[in-house]
Amino acid sequence: MLDPKFLRNELEITAERLATRGFILDVDNLTKLEEKRKSLQVATEDLQASRNAISKSIGQAKARGEDTSSIMAQVGDLGAQLDSKKAELAELLQQINSIAMSVPNLPDESAPVGADENDNVEVRRWGTPKVFDFEVKDHIDLGEALEGLDFKNAVKISGSRFIIMRGQIARLNRALGQFMLDLHTTEHGYTETYVPLLVNEESLLGTGQLPKFGEDLFHTKPATEEGQGLSLIPTAEVPLTNYVRDMIVDETELPMKMTALTPCFRSEAGSYGRDTRGVIRLHQFDKVELVQIAHPDHSMQALEDITSHAEKVLQLLNLPYRTMVLCTGDMGFGSSKTFDIEVWLPAQNTYREISSCSNMKDFQARRMQARYRSKADNKPALLHTLNGSGLAVGRTLVAVIENYQNQDGTITVPEALRPYMGGLSLIG
């Protein structure tokens, strides 16, 4: 969430910056609420001061042998008024906080201003798409012909947007995840982390999935008097980032770099009719997540680093891609700046997103109360959090199948993956 003080003191500037991402801040309503908050705050403080002063006079009156019943009654009356004002103030603050929790992050000044994905800006391109001398097939036809992708039985078992993988295609999928983990842990300095796949509501609030995006989650256990509800993770960003929730990290420990390979679960509530065939958009998919917990002074460089780490996977697999910086109107709810990496898919004759790398700055940290202790003044301050896909395994599988297809329907195994495939060089 945004800094409440900044939101109050710079309301017009905040509204202007949020408007660039298509979010209309109700300035009039917030102004009225803030005026009411100030009035209640002053009234509460005045009542508290009056009660304290009169309470102090009780002892003095008793020392003089005077009757204190009227003073005691006055203190009781002030106490009741004070309790009422405190309750009213608490309710108002909860209302303001609820609004603040629904406000997206401020875009970084370096993010291009735009309305939607058409205004995203390409920053670099790597590799040249292969020119095939035969008619290319998509991953669905190739995978089904190899008996490696089974959509029919997945629908029978679970419904649409699920997949069963078998044989060498399943092995290739597993190899991709292992390859990514090994690269990030041995070359890029991330610590491999095993995380829960079920998380509580506080964790989802911390990273910003709640309250705004609850419909995209699979809720497995409702909240009860005995405890919070549990939901399947939409991304390992949630448990990895929440690792530092309610913590004060020593500045010398920064940056903290964590990675995890997990299944991810999304209802895709807003994706009706999009990518209904194939492995591009599933309810359950594997992803290697990269998370960095960084010093505020270094988080923009960390964003460049995390993006390059995701790009390295595609370079080693020799898969052509382009990197886009998202415009303000296309960024995610909690992001201040985002790079999307798009891989070339020959069957679609276009680039498709395979990774999204974002700097959340202190947006998540404020929700989580994740802080570091500064060496300069020994005081706690909010951390910056970053995350990125390194990569989405299923989409990488699609890219490998399509880019490495042969005329006879076989798939050449990329050299970087052969050690993970027992030396196998050809599928089919």
UniProtKB/Swiss-Prot annotation:
One of its GO terms (cellular component) is cytoplasm. One of its GO terms (molecular function) is serine-tRNA ligase activity. Disulfide bonds: none annotated. Pathway: Aminoacyl-tRNA biosynthesis; selenocysteinyl-tRNA(Sec) biosynthesis; L-seryl-tRNA(Sec) from L-serine and tRNA(Sec): step 1/1. It comes from the Bacteria. InterPro entries: aa-tRNA-synt_IIb, aa-tRNA-synth_II, aa-tRNA-synth_II/BPL/LPL, Ser-tRNA-ligase_type_1, Ser-tRNA-synth_1_N, SerRS_1_N_sf, SerRS_core, tRNA-bd_arm. Pfam families: Seryl_tRNA_N (PF02403), tRNA-synt_2b (PF00587). It is an enzyme of class 6 (ligase). It catalyses: tRNA(Ser) + L-serine + ATP = L-seryl-tRNA(Ser) + AMP + diphosphate + H(+); tRNA(Sec) + L-serine + ATP = L-seryl-tRNA(Sec) + AMP + diphosphate + H(+). HAMAP family: Ser_tRNA_synth_type1. Belongs to the class-II aminoacyl-tRNA synthetase family. Type-1 seryl-tRNA synthetase subfamily. Homodimer. The tRNA molecule binds across the dimer. This is Serine--tRNA ligase. It comes from Shewanella frigidimarina (strain NCIMB 400). The gene is serS.
